[in-house]
Regions:
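N-terminal strand-loop-strand beta-hairpin
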Residues: 1-171, 207-238
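Conserved residues at beta->alpha junctions
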Residues: 11, 188-189
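Short phosphate-engaging motifs
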Residues: 16, 193-194
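Beta-strand-connecting loop/turn residues
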Residues: 55, 181-183
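Conserved active-site beta-strand-loop modules that form the wall/rim of enzyme catalytic pockets
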Residues: 74, 174, 185
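Active-site scaffold segments
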Residues: 129, 186-188
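A contiguous pocket-lining binding segment that forms or flanks enzyme active sites
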Residues: 143, 176-181, 188
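A hydrophobic, small-residue-rich beta->alpha segment in the mid-to-C-terminal subdomain
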Residues: 183, 190-192, 198-206
Length: 238
């Protein structure tokens, strides 16, 4: 099972970050905007058996999204969140669905670090992915095995690639995630490449985030005195 090494970074000023990407020569990947809508559903046993062992089983549905349109400022409702982006138009048919299983590496399991699967400054886990063509029946299979979808979260992801240079032999992917709790960037690859990319983007190791979106969402809810449910955009942002 291949390793996944990654970090997250909080983007405080999305417009300034886009200017940095442009200065670095980053280009969209996959479409004119490199942008997709992701609808994620995490499965677990009723007692949270997978989570207890640092494991994750996720079904992701990706739908192509057009570039967001500039809109006038709107008044925020009590339920709306500060970081909600204007909703890009989505096609009605998913572009792809991916089933992902993640777990601690053998070294982490031996070191009893499954709950916080990271080495040093980077998050490291075993990861395996498979493309799905019949998600409805897959969900029925999971339910038949006693599993259920217990946390759903969505985001808009824009993927950009830095050009191949002496620094990046084959370029480097930068994934920008617009979520209901803010905008983040994910960097995945060899640790040295991640560190170089983070530096180019104006960050240092003290800015690295190693937790997942579920943990970030739960912390956001605690900070606001809200009960965690699903991390979803309000209808007006879809």
């Amino acid at each position: 099972m291949p390793d996944e090494t990654e970090i997250k970074l909080k983007i405080r000023d999305p417009k300034a970050f886009q200017r940095i990407l442009k200065r670095l020569g980053a280009k969209p990947v996959g479409s004119a905007t490199g942008r997709v809508h992701e609808d994620n559903l995490i499965f677990d046993t009723p007692d949270g058996g997978l989570a207890k062992h640092g494991q994750l089983l996720r079904l992701r549905t990706e739908t192509a999204a057009a570039a967001s349109k500039k809109s006038s400022k709107t008044k925020k409702s009590k339920k709306s969140r500060k970081a909600n982006p204007p909703a890009p138009a989505k096609s009605s048919k998913p572009t792809r669905q991916i089933l992902t299983f993640k777990r601690p590496t053998a070294q982490q399991t031996a070191a009893h670090t499954s709950r916080y699967p990271s080495f040093g400054s980077h998050k490291v886990r075993d990861e395996i992915e498979a493309h799905v063509t019949d998600s409805d029946n897959l969900i029925k299979i999971f339910e038949g095995l006693g599993m259920r979808g217990w946390f759903r979260y969505e985001k808009y992801r824009s993927t950009h690639q830095l050009p191949a240079t002496n620094t990046w032999a084959h370029g480097f992917l930068i994934e920008v995630d617009e979520t209901p709790i803010g905008t983040f960037v994910e960097l995945e690859g060899p640790p040295a490449a991640i560190d170089r990319a983070a530096t180019e983007l104006g960050y240092s190791k003290k800015d690295y985030i190693l937790t997942n979106y579920l943990a970030l969402y739960a912390e956001d809810c605690r900070r606001k005195g809200q009960q965690p449910q699903n991390m979803l955009f309000p209808d007006k942002f879809r």
